[in-house]
Amino acid sequence: MAGINLNKKLWRIPQQGMVRGVCAGIANYFDVPVKLVRILVVLSIFFGLALFTLVAYIILSFALDPMPDNMAFGEQLPSSSELLDEVDRELAASETRLREMERYVTSDTFTLRSRFRQL
């Protein structure tokens, strides 16, 4: 159980759900089995939280967007560390290109070619 992943969005997953997909979306968000969430919902209904559970379920069923079909169940957005690693690689590649250009501009070859062009 990984807990809350701040990079995930809470969706309704009607493809995996029994009623509107709210329990499946919550299970995907918290990275727990769907059956566990469904059992907790049923237990909360039987142990005195029926009104709260039903109202929350109805509100979530209308408030949450359905998961797009192109996103697979369990698929997640890249984490912030992965995004930072990708940006770091791009910046390193840009720095390498900049150093190569700087080396060429400050070289004798560049000076010689620019003087030939001026003739």
From Swiss-Prot:
UniProt entry tagged with the keyword Membrane: yes
One GO location term (cellular component): plasma membrane
InterPro entries, A to Z: Phageshock_PspC, Phageshock_PspC_N, PspC
Lipid bilayer topology: Single-pass membrane protein
Keyword Signal assigned: no
Pfam family, one: PspC
Induction: By heat, ethanol, osmotic shock and infection by filamentous bacteriophages.
Entry keyword set: Activator, Cell inner membrane, Cell membrane, Membrane, Stress response, Transcription, Transcription regulation, Transmembrane, Transmembrane helix
Transmembrane parts of this sequence: 39-59
Localization per record: Cell inner membrane
GO biological process, one term: regulation of cellular response to stress
Stated role: The phage shock protein (psp) operon (pspABCDE) may play a significant role in the competition for survival under nutrient- or energy-limited conditions. PspC is involved in transcription regulation.
Quaternary assembly: Interacts with PspA.
Record-stated family: Belongs to the phageshock PspC family.
Xref: NCBIfam families: phageshock_pspC, PRK10697.1
Name of this protein: Phage shock protein C
Gene name of the record: pspC
